[in-house]
């Protein structure tokens, strides 16, 4: 009999508590149904009015968005139903606590029978209406706490219920607190994926910019490796800067004729290749200035192919054309030291012997020898441009870089003006008349 009485009480309690929960669930469900109906009405209105003027692809896109919105609404409905079920679970416990003091005999009847069987029968009804399992477990724990008091002490049962209303209150707050995070996934789902990826990339870039000044070895290394390379040529600009205007190519000559200025090269390279010091070079220049009167016959005897006493480019061309480049090198190497120093030209042969150029066999090397002239003219006449004070640079071939194919002509001494150069090249057959 007490079991049946308990069943009736449980059914009465469920009947008493269910209407409020049902009203809440129905109110929320009605709002959700109104949302779905509004979306459907929107789709119907779109189908009726604006979809007439849209293409098939645009209609598909609109339908896709409507379906996604409906799916998001359905996903949002599930936690709402769970909240309603929890409220239904909490309300019966409250009503039990309120009804227990008014009916102490019913509480005594509930304690006497086997608690396992009675609770197992009463709880499924609550769980069917509730849904979530953790809330059902909490309800079982609350029921397990109430039965232990013995039969006779009714006042203890009266004192026991007051803590019960305080215990279900925290679950309500704990269940309502996570409700804002329930809307958070909805916001993440509604945000397009490209925007999320762009935000992540921007955050990473901002983090890298923040880390680059503090940790230059991570992000700033490529920049640091580039800056010294960029600053290197800047610091070295003053050195090679003046060398660019010192090597002008005459635009009026053909491309196969290259005219270089020997005095515009760096003195360190030339002196190191010639293996002579500045003092020795000055002594050679002085000897050349004082003793060039009888130097040309000695040079002719040595086999350099220049007729003595003449300084015209025509004679120089004929005398230079008799022996080949190799023969002139051999003759310069076999020439004695005395007349060579007096003439000043064997210094160029020494330079060629120490650093033979790779383009000597391919082309011709012409050196126009000056006649008797003043020292200032001998030392200064060449292409206009920055010159070294040392006049010995005029007697040497200063460039040992290989030229593809061409003729290197070095002018020095008297008659090195533009007309003399053109006349000499014309007689050699190296100048093409443009007119």
Curated annotation (Swiss-Prot):
Biased composition annotated in UniProt, kind: Basic and acidic residues: 1-10
Region of interest called Disordered, as start-end residue ranges on this chain:
1-22, 92-276, 295-420
Q: Which domain of life is it from?
A: Eukaryota
- Which UniProt key words apply to this protein? Methylation, Phosphoprotein
Identify one Pfam family in the record. SARG
Q: Which residues carry this modification: Omega-N-methylarginine?
A: 252, 320, 378, 414
Positions carrying Asymmetric dimethylarginine are 252
Q: Which residues carry this modification: Phosphothreonine?
A: 45, 146, 167
Q: Where is the composition biased (Low complexity)?
A: 92-102, 113-126, 228-237
Where in the sequence does UniProt note compositional bias of the Pro residues kind? 146-169
Q: Where is the composition biased (Polar residues)?
A: 11-20
| Residues with PTM Phosphoserine | 8, 43, 166, 179, 212, 215, 312, 400
Its protein name is Proline and serine-rich protein 2
């Amino acid at each position: 009999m007490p079991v049946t009485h308990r069943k009736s009480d449980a059914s009465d309690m469920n009947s008493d508590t269910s209407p409020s929960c049902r009203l809440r669930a129905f109110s929320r469900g009605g709002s959700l149904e109104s949302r779905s109906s509004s979306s459907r009405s929107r789709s119907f209105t779109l189908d009726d009015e604006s979809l007439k003027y849209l293409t098939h692809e645009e209609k598909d896109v609109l339908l896709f968005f409507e379906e996604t919105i409906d799916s998001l609404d359905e996903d949002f409905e599930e936690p709402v139903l769970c909240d309603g079920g929890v409220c239904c679970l909490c309300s019966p416990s409250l009503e039990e606590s309120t009804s227990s003091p008014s009916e102490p005999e019913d509480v005594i009847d509930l304690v006497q029978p086997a608690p396992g069987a009675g609770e197992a029968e009463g709880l499924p009804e609550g769980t069917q209406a509730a849904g979530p399992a953790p809330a059902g477990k909490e309800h079982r724990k609350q029921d397990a706490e109430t039965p232990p008091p013995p039969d006779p002490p009714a006042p203890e049962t009266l004192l026991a219920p007051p803590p019960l209303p305080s215990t279900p209150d925290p679950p309500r707050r704990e269940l309502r607190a996570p409700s804002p995070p329930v809307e958070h996934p909805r916001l993440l789902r509604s945000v397009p994926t490209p925007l999320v990826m762009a935000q992540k990339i921007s955050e990473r870039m901002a983090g890298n910019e923040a880390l680059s000044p503090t940790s230059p070895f991570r992000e700033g290394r490529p920049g640091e490796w580039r800056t010294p390379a960029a600053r290197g040529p800047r610091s070295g600009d003053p050195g090679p800067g003046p060398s660019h205007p010192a090597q002008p190519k005459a635009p009026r000559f053909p491309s196969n004729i290259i005219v270089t200025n020997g005095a515009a090269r760096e003195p360190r390279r030339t002196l190191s290749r010639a293996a002579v010091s500045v003092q020795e070079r000055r002594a050679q220049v002085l000897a050349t200035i004082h003793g060039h009167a009888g130097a040309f016959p000695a040079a002719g005897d040595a086999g350099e192919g220049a007729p003595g006493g003449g300084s015209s480019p025509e004679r120089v061309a004929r005398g230079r054309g008799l022996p080949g480049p190799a023969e002139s090198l051999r003759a310069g190497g076999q020439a004695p030291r005395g007349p060579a120093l007096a003439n000043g030209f064997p210094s160029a042969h020494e330079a060629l012997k120490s650093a033979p150029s790779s383009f000597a066999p391919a082309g011709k090397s012409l050196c126009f020898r000056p006649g008797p002239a003043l020292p200032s003219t001998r030392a200064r006449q060449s292409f206009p441009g920055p010159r070294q004070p040392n006049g010995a640079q005029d007697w040497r071939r200063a460039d040992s870089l290989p030229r593809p194919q061409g003729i290197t002509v070095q002018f020095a001494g008297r008659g090195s003006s533009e007309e003399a150069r053109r006349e000499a090249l014309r007689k050699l057959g190296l100048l093409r008349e443009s007119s």
